[in-house]
Amino acid sequence: YFFSLFLVTIFLYKWLAKKTPSKNLPPSPPRLPIIGNLHQIGPDLHISLRDLARKYGPLMQLQLGRIPVLVVSSAEATREVLKTHDVVFSQRPITSAIDKLCYKGRDVAFSRYSEYWRQVRSTCVTQLLSNSRVHSFHNIREEEVALLIQNIENSASEVINLGEQLIQLTRNVVCRVSVGSEYLSGHKGKLYQKLLAEVTEMLAYTYSIGDFIPLLGWVDWLSGSKAKVEKTAKEVDAFLEGALRDHIKTMASNKGSANDDFLSILLEIREADAGSTLDEECIKAIVWDMILGGTETTSTTLEWIVAAIIKNPDVMFKLQKEVREIGKGKSKIEEVDLVKMNYLKAVMKESMRLYITAFLLPREAKQDVKLMGYDISSGTQVLINTWETARDPSLWDNPEEFRPERFLNSPIDYKGLHYEYLPFGGGRRGCPGIQFAMAVNELAVANVVYKFDFKMPDGERFEDLDMSGVPGISLYRK
C-alpha cells in the first residue's frame, strides 16, 4: 500500500512539474536551510547588499528566513520598479514592530495600497503638506531656527554637540506643527520626547526573529522585546488620545476653531465631512506618521548636511560667501532670501546624494510580475539600494568626492524622477513631505553658516571627521 502511494506521489510530482513552467529567477547567492541568506548580511546592511550585488548583479534575489527579497542596485532596475511596474510594487512590507507601533498600517507610510491609502495620502498632500500649508508654518520655522542660533551662541566658546542641537530644532518644529506648542515642555513635553526616542530606536534596531523564522517566534517573547514594543505602543496611543481629546475640547470652547496644527486640521476635516475616512484611529495614525517621519529623517538629513559642510572647508567658504553677501546687513537669514541661494541648494543636493538617509526603499510585490526578464512572485519584498545608485561611477563623475558644483545648472531634483538620485524615494510611495523637510533644512543651514565659523576640537582636523553611516530607520551618521 505504502509503496503504491509512494509511486503515485512521484507520478503526481513529475506531472505537476511539467504543467508548471520553471521560473526564471534573478541570480542568488547560495543559501542555507531555514535561515537562507541571513548569514551573509552584516551590520552595515547597505554595504553587505552592495558587495553581494557586485557579484550577482543589479537584480539579486535573497532568502531572509521565510522572506524572499529582491535587491535592486541600479538606476535602470529602479526605474523598472518605480515607474514601469509602480502599481505592482506599491505595497510596503510591515514588520511586527511596525504593525504595533504604527496603528496596524492605518498610517500613510505603511498602509496597504488601497482606496483607503489613496484617500489618506491625498489628505496629507493637499491639506497638511501642500506648498501653501508649508508656507503658513514659516513663523514657526524662523522662531525655532532663531532659538537654535541663540543656543549655539550661548555655547560658542565651548565644544558643542551640534547634532543634538539640530535634533532639538526639528523635534520642536515638528511638535508645534503636529500637535501644538503645549507639548514642547512640562510633563507633556517630556513624555513626547521619551516616546519619540523609544519608538525611533525600536523601529531602527528591534528585529523580530519571528518575522524571518516563525518557528523561532518564541525567542521574541523570551527576550522581552515583544512585550516592550506592545507596552510602548499602548503609551503612544494614550499620548495621542490625550492630545486628540484636548484638541476636541479646544475646538468646542472656540466654537469649531482650533490651532492650525495637523491634529486640528484633521479634526476640522472630519467635522466638515461626516462620510470622511478620518475616524479617530486614522487621525492618530496620520499625526504619529507626521511626527515620526518629520522628526527622524529631517534631523538625520540635517546632521549629515552640516557635517559635510564642516568636513569640506572649501565648500564652507563658498557657501558662507554666498549666504553672507545675500544677507549682508541683516541680523538673520529669512525664508525669502533662500530662493537666491543657488550654491546652498547645490550643497544640499550633494549632501543628500553622498550621505543619503533613505538608503533603502522598501516595497512589496502585490502580484506576480516579469521584471527585466525575471519572474518575481507576489509577496516578494523589494529593497532598492539608493545608497549604491547614488555612488555609481557609471552615473556620477568621481562619485566619492563631495562636489556641490555637479548640481549647478543640473536638471536633477528631489522629486523622484531621476532614478540615480532618490533622497525622498519615488513612485506612488515617494515621500510627500519634501517641501516641509527642505524648508526646515535650508533655513537652518543658511543661518548656521551665516552666523558661525567652525573649527575642530584641539588635535583634530576637518578631514578626519568620521562620515561613516550606521543603518537604522535611516542611515545615521556614526
From Swiss-Prot:
Annotated EC: 1.14.14.148
GO molecular function terms noted in the UniProt entry: angelicin synthase activity; heme binding; iron ion binding
Membrane topology, as annotated: Single-pass membrane protein
Functional pathway: Secondary metabolite biosynthesis
Keyword terms, alphabetized: Endoplasmic reticulum, Heme, Iron, Membrane, Metal-binding, Microsome, Monooxygenase, Oxidoreductase, Transmembrane, Transmembrane helix
Temperature characteristics of this protein: Optimum temperature is 27-30 degrees Celsius.
Broad enzyme group: oxidoreductase
Top-rank taxon: Eukaryota
PROSITE patterns in alphabetical order: CYTOCHROME_P450
Positions bearing the site annotation: Substrate specificity: 109, 293, 297
pH dependence: Optimum pH is 7.0.
GO biological process, one term: coumarin biosynthetic process
GO cellular component labels: endoplasmic reticulum; membrane
Reactions catalysed according to its record: (S)-columbianetin + reduced [NADPH--hemoprotein reductase] + O2 = angelicin + acetone + oxidized [NADPH--hemoprotein reductase] + 2 H2O + H(+)
InterPro entries: Cyt_P450, Cyt_P450_CS, Cyt_P450_E_grp-I, Cyt_P450_sf
Family the UniProt entry places it in: Belongs to the cytochrome P450 family.
Protein name: Angelicin synthase
Protein species of origin: Pastinaca sativa (Wild parsnip)
Taxon lineage: Eukaryota, Viridiplantae, Streptophyta, Embryophyta, Tracheophyta
Encoding gene per record: CYP71AJ4
